[in-house]
Amino acid sequence: MGSFVLHGNIIDSESPERLRVAADSYLVCEEGRCTGVFSALPERFSGLPLTDFGDRLILPGMTDLHLHAPQFAFRGLGMDLELLDWLNAHTFPEEAKYADLSYAALAYGQFVDCLRRSATTRAVVFGTVHPAATTLLMELLEASGLVSYVGKVNMDRDCPEALREADAAASLAATEQWLASARFAHTKPILTPRFVPSCSDALMQGLGELAARRGLPVQSHLSENLGEIALVQSLCPQTDFYAEAYDRCGLLSQPCIMAHCVHCPPEEQDLLQARGVFIAHSPLSNSNLSSGIAPVSAYLARGLRVGLGSDLAAGETENLFRVMAEAIRVSKLRWRLADDSASPLTVAQAFYLATRGGGAFFGNVGCFEPGFAMDAVVLDDSTLLHPQELTPLERLERCIYLADERHIAAKYVAGTRLF
C-alpha cells in the first residue's frame, strides 16, 4: 500500500443516478486509501510522488461479483443451449478436469493472467469441487495482486459422478479441509453451494451452520432460468419460492451474493432486501443461455443491492465494459418488449453497478471518496479516434461500448500499482 498522487480526468459515482467528473484534477492516496480529489493539489500533499496521466481517464477499479474460473477455458462455446443442458454438455465435463492439478495450474494461470490485465480489481469467483485445485486458484490470485473471494463448490446430487461428492458429510469435510489451507491476505474463502438442485437438504443445512459458525460469506445462483426454478419447486415443495430454500438453511443470513435473479417474484425480492443480499446481474450469460432479462432498474429503485457479474463462461468475456454495455442494451429490450413500467438502465447506473454497487460487497470500495480503497484503472482512449473533442463523460460512455484491456494504461489495487 502506497501514498501518492495521480493527475488526470477523474470520474466516479456519487449515486446510481449521478456521476462525478473532476477534469484536470488530482487524486490523493495515502496508505492505500483515497484521501480526496482536488482541482488543485493542496500544499500538504506536495511531497508525495505524483504520476501525471495527462488527459487520460482515471476510473474506480471494477468489481466482478460472479464468474467461474474453471469455465474460462471454454468461453465462447456451447451458446446454443439453455442453462441445464449447457451445464451437462459443457460445464460439468470441463470442471471434472480440475481433479488434475497440472491441468488446473495451466488453465487457472491463463484465467488469472487475463483477469489481471482487465479493468477488474476485485472479483468473487467459483472454483470446482476439488479442494487442492481451489487452493491453487487462490494462490495464483493472491500472487496477481487482485483482491478476491474464491469458493470451493459443493455438490452432492444431480451432477455427474466425477463431480458428485459422496454425501453431505463428505462435502462438508472437504470444505473444512479446503478452509484449513485457504489462508491468504487478499484472497478469502466464500462458501459455494452451486445451486439448490445440486445440493441435498443436509448439505445446505450443514453449509448454513458452517457459515454461521465461521462467519463466512456465501455465494450461489438464484432464479436464473425457468426450467431451473421449476426443478427447485419439485425438489423443495415446502417452499413458496426459490430463495426460501436457501433462507431456511441460514444461507442468506451471512454476507451473500446471489447470481442472476432474473425471475424473482415480489415476495422473493422482499426477502433478498430484508437479508441485504447482493444480486450479481449477469446480462451476457442471461442472453447467451436464453434465461431472460432481470428487472435491474426496478431492483435499484426499490433499494436492492446490485452489482455486475461477467459469469464466465456463460458470459463470453471478463471485460466488464462489455458487461455494462450489455446491461444497458438488454434493459432497453425489456422496457420496450416486456415491461415499460421501469426505465432502461442509464450509463450512470451501469457504471455504478460495475464500481460502487458491486464494490460494496468488499466494504468501502468502488469510488474515490475519502476512506475508500484506492482501486483505480487509467484508460488511454486515444486510439478510439474521433474528429472532435469529447467531454470526459462522452469519453467514458464510448469506453463502455468500445474499450478493452488494450486501453488500460495503469491499474491500482488498494494503493498498489499492478502495471
Stretches with model-predicted labels:
Residues M1-F45, R56-L57:
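N-terminal metal-binding scaffold of metallo-dependent hydrolase/deaminase domains
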Residues A132-C261:
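Metal-coordinating catalytic core of metallo-dependent amide/deamination hydrolases
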